[in-house]
Curated annotation (Swiss-Prot):
This is Protein GrpE. Signal peptide: none annotated. CDD domains: GrpE (cd00446). It comes from Aeromonas hydrophila subsp. hydrophila (strain ATCC 7966 / DSM 30187 / BCRC 13018 / CCUG 14551 / JCM 1027 / KCTC 2358 / NCIMB 9240 / NCTC 8049). The gene is grpE. Belongs to the GrpE family.
Amino acid sequence: MNHEEQKVEAMEQVEAQPVEPTDVDSEVTAEQARIAELEAQLDAAQQASLEERERAIRAVAEMENLRRRAAQDVEKAHKFALEKFAAELLPVLDNLERAIELADKENEALKPMIEGVELTLKSMQSSVGKFGLNPLDPLNQPFDPNAHQAMSMIENAELAPNTVIAVMQKGYELNGRVIRPAMVMVSKAPA
């Protein structure tokens, strides 16, 4: 038998064998199950990828917030580092102002000393002002409980109620933050 005859005989044998549909169906079913399994794995991997991406985005946002808060804390620390020192200087400023206020300006012998105290006060006010320490002088302004401390209330028909009519002690703020409220007398409507 030559090679051609063997091929023809093999083909006839293959054609003679009955093809059972269950074999094909089982192969298709197995392949479909494998495809479904792979699709499920792909979906799970995609879901895990999305979750990890969201987690990474949240971590980046959290780091940005942390960096921003740290920068704000450092800025506040620089801005208000002088708060205790400034609070200790307030009585000195008060005493210099009181000394000028109570000095006998008519006495010729005291005039050079009074001028010296005035210059010292101006110099000190200028120096502390450079660092953000500024006086609160609320005379004739509306009472603000955040910046003023009411020591008493006096009836006054000429001014609107809750207007500061006298300042007993100046208040001070450091870079916009009140470190000592002004002690004031406040008007109230006549009874």
